[in-house]
């Protein structure tokens, strides 16, 4: 078998996720990207509650009601000879653990920034996660059709707060009502903006050359002079694009535009397919696996319940790392040691499923899961190794959960353990009593859990406040010291959904004192799946 077609398929894959603060325009940009990839015909801007026109990528019932993207969905589309896999990440205040983990399955990220607001809190947190693997970052400065902050100032803020150099690729011509387009620094072209064309791909008028008198005629003498002055400053003060620095996560190419007006998104996509890496190598506990390895390997980074309300199923999302998936192939689930035939893997267009005949490195496929697959599971063609770097994050918010009907304790526990396996929430059972504590990274996760317990497990649960401030997974090599630690701290110990011992601290002060008191015990903020 000639290897050339396989190598070609690997080389043309680009797998990325979008990170942003809520309401920076992530869902809108997702829509426009799909429009350019011809995955959808018209972009249905995400409407508020009660509207029946919903964004293609927000499909779970609760998302439809709230107009937010709760679950990570996956969309694949062709663009300029490349095949792009876009992993949509929840952008709302919460759902962050899912979002964090999704970032472990991509080779590149697009950071969307609201240019009127600059760097916001959630963007900071997500960027921290991308730093764990030095993921390459592209930046899109959004909402230029509104009044924005000085673009130079916003770029400086990104550089100082997120510790990444910025290299502007395009530069805005005016903003708000005076927004006239963008100038491309490397092509020496100005693209002129027309408002009201956001739902389709517009024919853009291009003016070649910064000194072209046509430019003055198109945007006015004053704005043209301002643009030339700004660009002189920008070219003197900012970084030039350097692909190696980009691939090492040290420098981000910056694009300007308006996702709502569908302007500038294509420049970013062009940059993505031209500069972003094809599928990258991944570490396992035994060796590094490269995408062009002949044998199939992949890991599960997310489990999604009820993608199909008609069937009560769960789907495990698997990132293909190496080799080629073919329908009906036998794979080993390393954690259980079982060999399974995968005949019905799925590919996605957010909620629209289609069965996949083959998949290549960089692709995301869905495996039907009846409770046997967990986050972090590695699948191979027989090799016993495990991919590393798929973390669990210590929750920051806690509630005690209890039943309205005490007879349904068994269903409650089953529901919570399953929801924790798919990463919707973490569950802790204190060692010294029968409480059930739910831990999350954001408040909205609590609502999701109660709603899903009701609809999927027929359990009515309510929350109560609990005096827990943070949690850490604990371990210790010295058995004797660990026994003593457990004996003296029983009241603060719990088991998580995977039966891992956890220290539950009522306050940060308590945690710090306990850590000082037991230097041999390791307190972990993240735990490998």
UniProtKB/Swiss-Prot annotation:
Positions of GTP binding: 20-27, 88-92, 142-145
GO biological process assignments: regulation of translational termination
Predominant location category: cytoplasm
Superkingdom of the organism of origin: Bacteria
One Gene Ontology cellular component: cytosol
Limits of the tr-type G domain: 11-280
Pfam families xref list: EF-G_D2, GTP_EFTU, RF3_C
UniProt keywords, alphabetically: Cytoplasm, GTP-binding, Nucleotide-binding, Protein biosynthesis
GO molecular function: GTP binding; GTPase activity; guanosine tetraphosphate binding; translation release factor activity, codon nonspecific; translation release factor activity, codon specific
Subcellular location: Cytoplasm
InterPro entries for the chain: EF-G-like_DII, EFG_III/V, G_TR_CS, P-loop_NTPase, PrfC, RF3_C, RF3_dom_3_sf, RF3_GTP-bd
Matches recorded under HAMAP family: Rel_fac_3
Protein function: Increases the formation of ribosomal termination complexes and stimulates activities of RF-1 and RF-2. It binds guanine nucleotides and has strong preference for UGA stop codons. It may interact directly with the ribosome. The stimulation of RF-1 and RF-2 is significantly reduced by GTP and GDP, but not by GMP.
Protein family membership: Belongs to the TRAFAC class translation factor GTPase superfamily. Classic translation factor GTPase family. PrfC subfamily.
The protein's name in its UniProt record: Peptide chain release factor 3
UniProt source species: Erwinia tasmaniensis (strain DSM 17950 / CFBP 7177 / CIP 109463 / NCPPB 4357 / Et1/99)
Gene coding for it: prfC
């Amino acid at each position: 078998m000639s290897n050339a077609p396989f190598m070609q398929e690997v080389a043309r894959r680009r797998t990325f996720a979008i990170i942003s603060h809520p309401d920076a325009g992530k869902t809108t940009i997702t829509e426009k990207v799909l429009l350019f990839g011809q995955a959808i015909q018209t972009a249905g801007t995400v409407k508020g509650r009660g509207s029946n026109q919903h964004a293609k990528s927000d499909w779970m019932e609760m998302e439809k009601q709230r107009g937010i993207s709760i679950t990570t969905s996956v969309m694949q589309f062709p663009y300029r000879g490349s095949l792009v896999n876009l992993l949509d990440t929840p952008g709302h205040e919460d759902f962050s653990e899912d979002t964090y983990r999704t970032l472990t399955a991509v080779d590149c990220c697009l950071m969307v920034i609201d240019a009127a607001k600059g760097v916001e809190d959630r963007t900071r947190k997500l960027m921290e996660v991308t730093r764990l693997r030095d993921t390459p970052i592209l930046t899109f400065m959004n909402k230029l059709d509104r009044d924005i902050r000085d673009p130079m100032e916003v770029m400086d803020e990104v550089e100082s707060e997120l510790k990444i150099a910025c290299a502007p690729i395009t530069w805005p011509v005016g903003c708000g009502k005076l927004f006239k387009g963008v100038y491309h620094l490397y092509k020496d072209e100005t693209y002129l903006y027309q408002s009201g064309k956001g739902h389709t791909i517009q024919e853009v008028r291009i003016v070649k050359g910064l000194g072209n008198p046509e430019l003055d005629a198109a945007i006015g003498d004053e704005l043209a002079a301002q643009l030339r002055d700004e660009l002189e400053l920008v070219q003197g003060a900012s970084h030039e694009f350097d692909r190696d620095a980009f691939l090492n996560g040290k420098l981000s190419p910056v694009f300007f535009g308006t996702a709502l007006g569908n302007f500038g998104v294509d420049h970013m996509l062009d940059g993505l397919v031209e500069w972003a890496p094809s599928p990258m190598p991944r570490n396992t506990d035994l060796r590094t696996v490269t995408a062009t390895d002949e044998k199939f390997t992949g890991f599960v980074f997310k489990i999604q319940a009820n993608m199909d309300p008609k069937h009560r199923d769960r789907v495990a999302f698997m990132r293909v790392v190496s080799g080629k998936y073919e329908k009906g192939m036998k794979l080993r689930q390393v954690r259980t040691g079982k060999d399974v035939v995968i005949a019905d893997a799925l590919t996605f267009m957010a909620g629209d499923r289609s069965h996949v005949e083959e998949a290549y490195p960089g692709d995301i496929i869905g495996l039907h899961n009846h409770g046997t697959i967990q986050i972090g599971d590695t699948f191979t063609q027989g090799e016993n190794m495990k991919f590393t770097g798929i973390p669990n994050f210590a929750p920051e918010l806690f509630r005690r959960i209890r039943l309205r009907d005490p007879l349904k304790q068994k269903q409650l526990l089953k529901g919570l353990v399953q929801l924790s396996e798919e990463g919707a929430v973490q569950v802790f059972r204190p060692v010294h009593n029968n409480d059930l504590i739910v831990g999350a990274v954001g408040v909205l996760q609590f609502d999701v859990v109660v709603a899903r317990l009701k609809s999927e497990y027929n359990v009515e649960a309510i929350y109560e406040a609990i005096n827990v401030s943070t949690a850490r997974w604990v371990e210790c090599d010295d058995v004797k010291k660990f026994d003593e630690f457990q004996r003296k701290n029983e009241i603060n110990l719990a088991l998580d959904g995977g039966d891992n011992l956890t220290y539950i601290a009522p306050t940060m002060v308590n945690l710090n004192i306990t850590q000082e008191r037991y230097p041999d015990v390791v307190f972990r903020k993240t735990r490998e799946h």
